[in-house]
Every structure is written in C-alpha cells, then in structure tokens.
UniProtKB/Swiss-Prot annotation:
It comes from Granulibacter bethesdensis (strain ATCC BAA-1260 / CGDNIH1). Belongs to the universal ribosomal protein uS12 family. With S4 and S5 plays an important role in translational accuracy. Interacts with and stabilizes bases of the 16S rRNA that are involved in tRNA selection in the A site and with the mRNA backbone. Located at the interface of the 30S and 50S subunits, it traverses the body of the 30S subunit contacting proteins on the other side and probably holding the rRNA structure together. The combined cluster of proteins S8, S12 and S17 appears to hold together the shoulder and platform of the 30S subunit. This is Small ribosomal subunit protein uS12. GO terms for biological process: translation. The modification 3-methylthioaspartic acid is found at residue 89. Part of the 30S ribosomal subunit. Contacts proteins S8 and S17. May interact with IF1 in the 30S initiation complex. HAMAP family: Ribosomal_uS12_B. One of its GO terms (cellular component) is small ribosomal subunit. It holds the Pfam family Ribosom_S12_S23.
Length: 123
C-alpha cells in the first residue's frame, strides 16, 4: 500500500479499458474476404449449428464472424462487410457479417427487423 507521499508524487494510474473489437481499428465496419465458411456448436446449455465464416480483412487481420439470419449465400472468396458485436454462446466470435451488403444477400421473406437483414420492404 503506497504512502501519502508516494501517491502525491506518482498518483494512481487508471485502468485502461480493453478494446472489444481490435480488428476494426476504430472503424464502424471493415471489408474482408471469406477464407472459410463453416458451422460450429455453441457453449454448454445451448445446442445448434451456428453459421460462421473466417474472414481476412483489408488490414490483414483474420477474424471469425457470425452469419446472422436463416440461410445464406456465402462461400469461399465472397467479399463481405463486418461489424462489431459478439455472439455470447460462441467463444472467439466477436464480429457479425452485414446482410444485404457486397456479396452477402439479404433475407428475402423477412418481415420484421428488416434493416438488420438487408430485406426490402414488402409490397
């Protein structure tokens, strides 16, 4: 425990908040190319086959990102846009792929929360 004099001389150093999405480098989104598209299983209480893609970004980072929604058209060499946002039951998945942008198609029959899934307004 420091003395009063030590605190006056040096003070306390505040804890630095760690970056949750380092690969974005402060940008809202980043572009990348899919190097592998596959499914993986979630952590303990849940059970599913979650769709994920390994993406090489324009800044050289390689990250695993989640493909949201039902069905997708992604394959190797697809160009995608990723945003931050982790998937709680998939360890190591800290990014989401944006639907309806670049090579990723939106979801056709989507009625609610359409903006998140790149779906046009139904007639």
């Amino acid at each position: 425990m420091p003395t009063i004099n030590q605190l006056i001389a040096k003070g306390r150093e505040p804890n630095k908040a760690r970056n949750k999405v380092p690969a974005l480098q402060g940008c809202p989104q980043k572009r990348g190319v899919c190097t592998r598209v596959y499914t993986t299983t979630p952590k303990k209480p849940n059970s599913a086959l979650r769709k994920v893609a390994k993406v090489r970004l324009t800044n050289g980072y390689e990250v695993v990102s989640y493909i949201p929604g039902e069905g997708h058209n992604l394959q190797e060499h697809s160009v995608v846009l990723i945003r931050g946002g982790r998937v709680k039951d998939l360890p190591g998945v800290r990014y989401h792929i944006l639907r309806g942008v670049l090579d990723t198609q939106g979801i056709a029959k989507r009625r609610q929360r359409r903006s998140l899934y790149g779906a046009k307004r139904p007639k």
